[in-house]
Amino acid sequence: MRRRIKPIVVYLFFFLVIGGLILSDHQHHRQVESQVEKTEKTTQTSETEKNKVVEERLVSMTLEEKVGQLFWARVPSSHQLEDLQSYHFGGYLLFGRDFQGQTLEDMKALTDRYQAASKIPLLIGSDEEGGTVTRISSILETPFQSPLELYQKGGMEAIRSDTRQKAELLKSVGINAGLFPVADLASNPSAFIYDRTIGQDAQTTASYVEEVVTELQKNKVGSTLKHFPGYGDNGDSHTDIIQDNRSLDELRQADLLPFQAGIDAVRIVFWFRTIFYPRLILFRHRSHQKSMIFFAKNSTSMELL
């Protein structure tokens, strides 16, 4: 009798242990699932609350205020505060002249005054590509290096570290949007845009763009992809009328990939370039501006807000 009881006790112990493990594992999974569901509900509630705030603000806005919010204006040389109140701009863009002779403390005080003068919080942006295009870091002892130099020295890790430093600096002076990264491709080192690119192929540039915009978003700084749909090896469109004879298929195979990577990663701003594309049929019956917006919407997964 004792011999029969002993195996039964062993089996019972075995099933209790295994059953306990299964029950414990099940409870753990339920806790994890419950936490995930709670997080998702919190996120949905947060988004709903944000949308509600925006909708309430829109209802209370005048037509003039709504129109003004469409403009991201360069800071005028005079009457900066008055213009914010008169035209209800959505934001101000800070360029080289705005930083001349200023300290970081001066810039923070300046952006604080801009925000205080605006009824609606401003989007304050500035170029800080690094290298040949620096704004705020130009008043520092050591300006930021170009993405080309950084990538050659330290790869993507150097890019990530640099982006974090830029985000911290911009936020410290009240700048909440960066007019970078440059998403252009250029194969010719003598091309106008080459020194401002990462100097790599489409796939590597796409990875670079994704890293930068994601890092900026983590640090709560906006980003801008430029110059859509890609400068290529063309000349300087600031000083001349440039014609790009590439087809839509050619652009899709390479130049558009970095822009798509940025769109897939975060909500993004596009910076368009003024170059004529005779091989794109969509330009025949539209103004240049409408054509570029139509092209951006239909050649990428971009949603126009």
State the predicted function of each range.
Residues 23-68:
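N-terminal, intrinsically disordered, polar/charged segments of Gram-positive cell-envelope systems
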Residues 70-75, 124:
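Short, hydrophobic beta-strand segments that form beta-sheet elements in well-ordered domains
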Residues 86-205, 232-244, 273-283:
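Enzymes and membrane/adaptor proteins characterized by extended Gly/Ser/Thr/Asp/Glu-rich
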Residues 62, 100-112, 207-305:
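Second-shell residues forming the walls of enzyme active-site clefts
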Residues 2-29:
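Sec-dependent N-terminal signal peptides of Gram-positive bacterial secreted proteins and lipoproteins
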Residues 74-86, 158-169, 251-258:
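Short, acidic/polar
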Residues 42-44, 49, 80-81, 86-88, ...:
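Short leucine-rich amphipathic alpha-helices used at interfaces
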Residues 66-69, 87-92, 118-122, 171-176, ...:
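Loop/turn elements at helix/coil->beta-strand transitions in domains of secreted/extracellular proteins
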